[in-house]
Amino acid sequence: MAVAQAEAVMRSIAEWDIRVPVELVTIPTIQDQYPELAKEVDGRAPYVWELEKALADGVIDLSVHSLKDMAAKRNPLLPVCAVSQREDPRDVLVLPSGVGRLLKGRPLGCSSVCRRYQLGKLFPGIQLKMVPGDVLSRLDRLDNGEFSGMVMSAADLKTLGLESRINRYFTAREMVPGCGQGFVAVQCRAGERVGYLANYHNANSWEISLAELAFSQTLGGGHSSPATAHAWIDGGQMTIRGYTVDRQGEKIPGMFSGPVKRAQKLGVELAAYLQAEANERG
């Protein structure tokens, strides 16, 4: 999927100016080779910091990621310099090929703690199992009979041309998407000129991502946290809705709205409010 995302960035650069030289560089990561050993680092997916090292060392000039994988701590020397228009942010249910319903006796798979938490509320009593690896490897395990179903990102499947595998879309109220889900982010080295990314960058996406990532950073989130938030813009106003979890595992929901120019502050304020509510519960 990373290659497909990078190729979309390359096409956008070529449309801006065909004379800008662009080369695709693929970098093998520990997540590609040993997905079961890959661990988050500061709230980032493991492949992110490996690509960031290549960027910092000058091996590459741009790095392309799913924004949801880099939603916690950020390196100011390697800023996000462009964010794509948002693809479908919803989570979806995928069943084994040729199967029309969840099969009894097999777990339902997912790849993040916030999905696992929300699925436990939607399907009480069902066995849930975390599944590492990329989209295709997870689908292989699903089709080989290891799982009754797999909950995945609609955006990831659509990027790979696998929309036909989707059996059910969860609304953003049923399953609040992960922070940054559906966005592709481009990283560069601080201070470098990246005007050639003007066609790729989406202003509304930038503001929404600021709100969601501010929420995640304030709560110390990432794939290892059950908390998440989803923001949207309507008529110059931004709304961000999310939740955290108290020590007893109960959901604490909240929603803030305000002018788009306050995007980052809205994310921080929602997170702070939810954290205060959780602290009051003890």
Tell what function each PLM region has:
Residues 67-68, 74-125:
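A conserved helix-loop-strand patch within extracytoplasmic ligand-binding domains
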Residues 2, 48, 112-113:
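Helix N-cap/beta->alpha junction signal
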Residues 36-62:
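Short, structured active-site "lid" loops
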Residues 1-42, 116, 121-282:
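Small-molecule-sensing regulatory modules
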Residues 28, 47-48, 65-70, 152-157:
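Beta->alpha turn/N-cap motifs
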Residues 60-64, 148-149:
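Short, Asp-centered acidic motifs that coordinate Mg2+ and/or phosphate
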Residues 31-35, 63, 71-74:
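Short active-site-adjacent helix-start/loop capping segments
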